[in-house]
């Protein structure tokens, strides 16, 4: 997570360097891509971490993709240990985590273009069908903070 955090935090400097080497539009597109990819990297890292921790705790191996579904992953831990994700995150953090995971899904599988299924699944009122998800630096950093907090909590489970 530290590498992803440093990358996200240094995007302005990278954009300046890339602008010197290429042009402003190319630099902007490259930095936007890195920022969008950070969502995927964080979610993928969390999925694998949660799968491994769950197996360590329960002896049961679940599909790694089960842990990109926030409620499902939380339920696995709750059923096994009595503590779901809500034991470690506030309700607001859980809501944001679910939203970020949904945004990552639409970025990965629909090139960031919002469809009705995304709106129905996420409840995201910031976008309409046909618009493109825009990842903000503060959102990427927020997702990292939430995942670090949740991962620390999961590490306390036995």
Over which residues does each language-model region extend?
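Amphipathic alpha-helical interface elements
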Residues: 1-122, 129-158
